[in-house]
Swiss-Prot record:
Residues 14-40 have a biased composition (Basic and acidic residues). The gene is APRR7. It comes from Arabidopsis thaliana (Mouse-ear cress). Residues 79-197 form the Response regulatory domain. This is Two-component response regulator-like APRR7. CDD domains: psREC_PRR. Residues 344-353, 467-487, 519-535 have a biased composition (Polar residues). One of its GO terms (molecular function) is DNA binding. PROSITE patterns: CCT, RESPONSE_REGULATORY. Residues 669-711 form the CCT domain.
Length: 727
């Protein structure tokens, strides 16, 4: 190309590369031509190298006349294709690039830039393009460059004022080598030559392929070791050395797009030469190009011998190593089988379908057509079987110990309540009730205390009455039964209820006379020592007479705590028999329990709200009203029970507030609230009066165009005279 063609358009300067001396002369003239314009735009530069007053500029900041790229590059000049649709931004970035000794080819949009690139006579080293442009965006231009046979080796640098992570990720994943955020800084433009240097090194084969193989064998071993430690600490026996293939399979020189993932592990064990310029802190971003030897959807793992060896050094357990070798398996077992190794070593094995296999050496649970079988070797359970004969206590201790391992995969399904499975439902009710009792209740020394941290939810709400004595000891009882009873089993239930009634009567005879429960004609007491609980049988839904439900005053005398603790076992014997009855209100299949205690006594009521009245109401829709004051509400759910007077408006919250001290606290609280409301009312009244008075005075003031004005002296005198005459 001759000099006339170069001077035709300042936007596309084309230099003849045959004569190097003529090229340098043109660069000098172009630099001197734009020096004044750059000074007017605030870009100070000094190209007077020979003057004594000039600044000492570093080598990379000097003009193209003094910079010799041949000293460390295979090219004499570096030509940058700048693609920017904004004229002002393009002019400033062009000036900065020329000040950094680059030759600039300008383009206003992507189509114009692609025309320049299609002409193979135009030598372009770097493409610096804007992302968002009309006609052809920067990403579209990037795709065209990468799909071209001869231009695919040119490094493309994206720039934009939108620095969102999604846009950056999209550009880098498409194949860009770097992303610059506007406004562009001069220090970022000075290091653009490093991309050209990487291309030269990769094409000549003297260095690494653009930093894709920066990860050495030592880095690989460290990553494997670290991942193994992480997998061991989290008790998930997965292959910790699984990583992504970070090798660059392109042999055509497109190595500047390297890995920038979290785990860059080379599968190939051969050591590779790492160049000094391919450091991790380089400014260019790197993108993964997967190796064709390993598909991207497969996970690459090292041989199992290395992993087993490291785990043997850590655990010294052959079984653990064998489990690690087959860590990802398809089959999943829901059965719980004991293992010989300790529980801490084989807590859970993570499957590929996110299933757990829990193993324990203490217990084995089988749910089938027969009764529930819970076997244990603990001496505490044997002692419990020998002492009281209450087998469900042993079930309670087992269920509390093994509740958390059972949770992920074992679900006790709802059992059908036919004649063949009535016994299973009874034992399940025993286990569920014993597992949900209050942990603070003291038994006769046979129940094993559980020290696990249990999340205890509060039963208080914004609509419940204020009772600090009951709220402090309130524990959620939950749903105490999940099997609904059918009509065809009503006869069996009546028989079992009568048997429980007879057994309870025998127990009352064994107790002292003054602490014996008073049983009416149509109701029976649930082993309460101080209260008369009305609980009717399904076959006789009558309302008993007042004489049958009368209570002697001698039975309300306080008893020692140890005496009541001895009766705790009797209170829990007939829980399942009581649960077999249908719900009294017919609202749901959930049995609501309200456990009220005075001096550690236990009182059971079904779907009832506890009030402070002194009489016990009877009937199928009644509630058990006791004389306990400030008792402990242990398992009350918001049921649908009715009050004792039969009005049907009971809330079932069970707040026992019959104590005189509680009444005093409530009265004090009400008095304080009344006083506060009165003060607030007076304060608001004062503000209202003050506002009204000021408003009245403001209306009386004279105004001129909406502004207040002062009265003149004459007007004031006239008003004074009028006031005197009126008076």
């Amino acid at each position: 190309m001759n000099a006339n063609e170069e001077g035709e358009g300042s936007r596309y300067p084309i230099t003849d590369r045959k004569t190097g001396e003529t090229k340098f002369d043109r660069v000098e003239s172009r630099t001197e031509k734009h020096s004044e314009e750059e000074k007017t735009n605030g870009i100070t530069m000094d190209v007077r190298n020979g003057s004594s007053g000039g600044l000492q500029i570093p080598l990379s900041q000097q003009t193209a006349a003094t910079v010799c790229w041949e000293r460390f590059l295979h090219v004499r000049t570096i030509r940058v294709l700048l693609v920017e649709n904004d004229d002002c931004t393009r002019y400033i970035v062009t000036a900065l690039l020329r000040n950094c000794s680059y030759e600039v080819v300008e383009a206003s949009n992507g189509i114009q830039a692609w025309k320049v690139l299609e002409d193979l006579n135009n030598h372009i080293d770097i493409v610096l393009t804007e992302v968002i442009m009309p006609y052809l965006s920067g990403i579209g231009l990037l795709c065209k460059i990468l799909n071209h046979k001869s231009r695919r080796n040119i490094p493309v640098i994206m720039m934009s004022s939108h620095d969102s992570m999604g846009l950056v990720f999209k550009c880098l994943s498409k194949g860009a080598v770097d992303f610059l955020v506007k406004p562009i800084r001069k220090n970022e433009l000075k290091i653009l030559w490093q991309h050209v240097w990487r291309r030269c090194q990769s094409s000549s084969g003297s260095g690494s392929e653009s930093g894709t193989h920066q990860t050495q064998k030592s880095v690989k071993s460290k990553s494997i070791k670290k991942s193994d430690q992480d997998s061991g600490s989290s008790d998930e026996n997965e292959n910790g050395s699984i990583g992504l293939n970070a090798s660059d399979g392109s042999s055509d020189g497109s190595g500047a797009q390297s890995s920038w993932t979290k785990k860059a592990v080379d599968v190939d064990d051969s050591p590779r030469a790492v160049s000094l310029w391919d450091r991790v802190d380089s400014t260019c971003a790197q993108v993964v190009h997967s190796n064709p030897e390993f598909p991207s959807n497969q996970l690459v793992a090292p041989p199992a011998e290395k992993e087993t060896q490291e785990h043997d050094d850590k655990f010294e357990d052959v079984t653990m190593g064998r489990d690690l070798e087959i860590s990802i398996r398809r089959n999943c077992d829901l059965a719980l089988e004991p293992k010989d190794e300790p529980l801490s070593k084989t807590t859970g094995i993570m499957r590929q379908d996110n299933s757990f296999e829990k193993s324990s050496s203490k217990w084995k649970m089988k749910v089938g057509k027969g009764p529930l079988d819970l076997s244990s070797e603990s001496p505490s359970s044997k002692q419990m079987h020998e002492d009281g004969g209450s087998s469900f206590k042993a079930m309670s201790s087992h269920l509390q110990d093994n509740r958390e391992p059972e949770a992920p995969n074992t679900h006790l399904k709802t059992l059908d309540t036919n004649e063949a499975s009535v016994k299973i439902s009874e034992e399940l009710m025993h286990v569920e009730h014993s597992s949900k009792r209050h942990r603070g209740t003291k038994d006769d020394g046979t129940l094993v205390r559980d020290d696990r941290n249990v999340l205890r939810r509060s039963e208080g709400s914004a609509f419940s009455r204020y009772n600090p004595a009951s709220n402090a000891n309130k524990i959620s009882g939950g749903n105490l039964g999940s099997t609904s009873l059918q009509d065809n089993n009503s006869q069996d239930l009546i028989k079992k209820t009568e048997a429980a009634y007879d057994c309870h009567s025998n127990m009352n005879e064994s107790l002292p006379h003054n602490h014996r429960s008073h049983v009416g004609s149509n109701n029976f007491d649930m082993s309460s020592t101080t209260e008369n609980n009305a609980f009717t049988k399904p076959g006789a839904p009558k309302v008993s007479s007042a004489g049958s439900s009368s209570v002697k005053h001698s039975s309300f005398q306080p008893l020692p705590c140890d005496h009541h603790n001895n009766h705790a076992s009797y209170n829990l014997v007939h829980v399942a028999e009581r649960k077999k009855l249908p719900p009294q209100c017919g609202s749901s299949n959930v049995y609501n329990e309200t456990i009220e205690g005075n001096n550690n006594t236990v009182n059971y009521s079904v779907n009832g709200s506890v009030s402070g009245s002194g009489h016990g109401s009877n009937g199928p829709y009644g509630s058990s009203n006791g004389m306990n004051a400030g008792g402990m509400n242990m398992g009350s759910d918001n049921g649908a029970g009715k009050n004792g007077n039969g009005d049907g408006s009971g809330s079932g919250s069970g707040s026992g507030s019959g104590n005189l001290a509680d009444e005093n606290k409530i009265s004090q609280r009400e008095a304080a609230l009344t006083k506060f409301r009165q003060k607030r009312k007076e304060r608001c009244f004062r503000k209202k009066v003050r506002y009204q008075s000021r408003k009245k005075l403001a209306e009386q003031r004279p105004r001129v165009r909406g502004q207040f004005v002062r009265k003149t002296a004459a007007a004031t005198d006239d008003n004074d005279i009028k006031n005197i005459e009126d008076s």
